[in-house]
A protein has these predicted regions:
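Conserved "right-hand" nucleotidyltransferase catalytic core of DNA-directed polymerases
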Residues: 1-90, 95-101, 191-197, 202-227
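Helical catalytic core of nucleic-acid polymerases
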Residues: 52-192, 198-199, 215
């Protein structure tokens, strides 16, 4: 449960200590500049419509790993302007439960929470996922399907919190922690891309809020380096 609280620090977001950006540090610096801008103009006290207009206007475009990218307060998107055709090892690097995992790992669950139910729901779903995978590996398809279906209500509850934290009418409203989640989520994926660029021959095909699609040479060395 949550108890609606006014924190008054929507734009006082911070960067997580795990970030080790070098080549693309300037993207993090752009977010830092936006924080300064918002605080200096007192955006916290603007009405809902004006804040929404400001948020939508904040986009930073740059090229990352040869692919045009757009960063903002809602997420990141990177894709080539032209179709890409590749054969070989195309990997979809999907971050499982990205936002829920980040909220728990870095203490960013809404500060309006009155209990630890979010972590309980997270752990319950994780246990079900483990059973689903085990059943699938053992060839028990019906059981695996059953466990997958059982997870759905928990998955919806977990994913609902990120949106609720930006909804003024919701008791879970905590826009600062939502900003921390969205911004650091983008920067951690950017950090991953920066580290993957050292793999000889690797190509980034697409990136989005919670995952990447990459192409790597069909060699054991390339796969082991990525792994």
């Amino acid at each position: 449960g949550c108890s609606k609280t006014h924190f008054g620090d929507e734009f006082d977001f911070f960067f997580l200590p795990c970030l080790k950006l070098k080549k693309y540090k300037y993207v993090q610096e752009w977010f830092a500049e936006k924080r300064k801008e918002a605080l200096e103009m007192g955006l916290q006290d603007f009405d809902k419509k004006d804040k929404k207009t400001w948020y939508k206007s904040q986009n930073f475009e740059t090229v990352v790993a040869g692919i045009p990218h757009t960063f903002g307060f809602g997420g990141l998107h990177g894709a080539s302007d032209k179709p890409i055709h590749r054969k070989g090892q195309i990997l979809h690097v999907d971050v499982n439960n990205y936002y829920p995992s980040m909220l728990i790992a870095w203490g960013l669950v809404t500060r309006a929470a009155t209990n630890n139910n979010f972590k309980m729901v997270y752990d319950t779903r994780k246990a079900m996922k483990k059973k689903q995978v085990a059943a699938a590996k053992a060839g028990r398809k019906a059981e695996a399907k059953q466990w997958k279906k059982a997870q759905l209500p928990y998955k919806k509850m977990l994913n609902a919190l990120s949106g609720a934290m930006k909804d003024e009418t919701n008791a879970a409203y905590d826009p600062r922690n939502n900003n921390c989640m969205c911004i650091n989520g983008q920067l951690m994926l950017l950090d991953l891309i920066e580290h993957l660029e050292v793999v000889p021959g690797l190509e980034l095909i697409q990136s989005n809020t919670d995952g990447l699609i990459i192409w790597i040479p069909d060699t054991d060395e390339a796969f082991e380096t990525v792994d």
